């Protein structure tokens, strides 16, 4: 295994993406990529695959890969020229670059491709490149498979809900009949002792915007016991359904453990005889109706009073029990798959810089022998 020092421009040729006004887009088979990832599809492709894409303006530092033909937008840099290198290896290599070091000093900072082409990189022989991308690709493929399975389980769950609880059923009660609606609060940001990294889970709408996970136990910041006592935040039990009531309205998640939230939520603690699954599915199916209740103001928000008064058809106990029996295993499987994905992502992110630098010899990596202790060691050393 040999490694050679080169510049980025010697292994890939980044180019500016293509204009495509939204008014000219026609849904089709080809993915459209902006600086923040896929943003829809188009009936035509601008380039053939494989293709790597990263941000030129806007979101900087994220890197995307398309095996198929696609359309990189003008906010991105892309390349289909890999100069004899493994395209997937180049994709992972780009993920390790210090992109922000190459931002232009202008009113709207962006990446100048001529500057970033001078970035020094160290690359191995082609055989080692494919071995590295193979290991990292296996982890990404498993994450993708788990995500697709979770999506399928979500479809099953909502289809069963729709069958048992039709949308045209007569209203017989309000949301507060099926659970307790609880708001949140924020400890003073001026008191650093109120916040920590391993305390009481404290969730904000931004935390939900940064994840596609259905279950959540911690956000960016946790709060301390002192921080919790300093404000009116309430501890929501595991299984509570979090619903963002402003900025924006309609993010939904399930508490994987006891959590608190900031004031951007009106969360529901379901009654035992109703269950988490029913409340979750009701909110998913009615989030646009709820959002409309908060519209028409300068700062759209759904108040606690509004939330409590949302009309619904109170489920019969027999139907509720049937749905809970069906939904319980699905929720457990979804939570387990999300947990596995976080572990796989942690492993991938720990391996990535070490494989790319040659610190870890890829020929010595056996994914079948990797356990949580190995992952913990990698993360600690990272």
Predicted regions and their residues:
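DNA target-recognition domains and sequence-specific DNA-contacting regions of bacterial/archaeal
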Residues: 2-123, 173-315, 363-382
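Non-catalytic DNA-recognition/assembly elements of restriction-modification systems
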Residues: 1-34, 120-186, 197, 313, ...
